[in-house]
Regions:
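Alpha-amylase-like alpha-glycosidases and glucanotransferases acting on alpha-linked glucans and related
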Residues: 16-235
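Conserved, well-ordered alpha-helix/loop/beta-strand core segments that scaffold catalytic motifs
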Residues: 1-14
Length: 235
């Protein structure tokens, strides 16, 4: 129905799954669990701009060595299944494939975690070999992004993300302002599920930032949501 109306659907898939999911229950060897089925380490991200204690997600981590021994079959089937329902697939926390933040089970914050090397290109080469080289994947490449993460993304020509609010807000990062993009291989977002709505965000900004947006877009700011869409479309 969507295709008949020239609409394409973008799906969204998290890198990690929940401890109480059927994925973990049915595939315990794929995860870092103890003999009772509890995680030995859990997922999260270190302290950053958004949080002084990081984010403790609590998901069980993958046993990547075991995944490799299976030819990454579980991941291949996961991607294959998702692409039967959508045209494109955004993978959340893409940087976790290059290196992931492992927090010892029982910690109350993510502060005491450690960066552990992920499967890197080995995983995506296996997915390409099974599903073809032109797999329609977007990489959520926000947060702590290193040159190694960018290299992994670019090796497979996965589009990254540009969030307009990051370019005009107090982060003041020109990499997210359309006319400063250094690549066309990216997806421009007005915001994400982690952001306020565009109008809500705009109304909370100091007058200096509001004025900057109005001057950048030659607009009065009364329809800033549509202005941001225009910025994206003109990028």
């Amino acid at each position: 129905y969507a295709h008949e109306h020239e609409v394409e659907i973008i799906g969204d898939i998290p890198i990690f799954v929940s401890l109480d999911s059927c994925d973990v229950w049915a595939n315990k060897k794929l995860f870092q669990l103890d003999t009772k089925g509890y995680p030995t380490c859990v997922a999260g991200v270190p302290p950053d701009y958004f949080s002084a204690t990081g984010q403790l997600w609590g998901n069980p981590l993958y046993d990547w060595d075991y995944h490799k021994s299976t030819g990454y079959r579980w991941w291949i089937e996961r991607i294959r299944r998702q692409l039967t329902m959508v045209d494109y697939l955004r993978i959340d926390h893409f940087r976790g494939f290059e290196a992931y933040w492992a927090v010892p089970a029982g910690e109350e914050t993510a502060v005491n975690g450690t960066w552990i090397k992920g499967p890197c290109e080995d995983l995506f080469l296996a997915i390409q070999n099974a599903l073809g080289k032109d797999i329609p994947i977007f990489a959520e490449d926000l947060g702590v992004i290193t040159p190694e993460v960018e290299q992994l993304r670019d090796m497979f020509e996965f589009p990254g993300m540009k969030v307009l609010q990051f370019g005009f807000g107090d982060m003041d990062d020109r990499n997210y302002v359309p006319h400063f993009y250094t690549t066309t291989n990216c997806i421009c977002y007005t915001g994400t599920h982690d952001n306020d709505t565009t109008m809500g965000w705009y109304e909370e900004q100091p007058e200096m930032i509001k004025d900057r947006i109005r001057r950048y877009g030659n607009t009065d700011g009364n329809r800033v949501s549509l202005d941001f869409i225009r910025f994206c479309m003109g990028s």
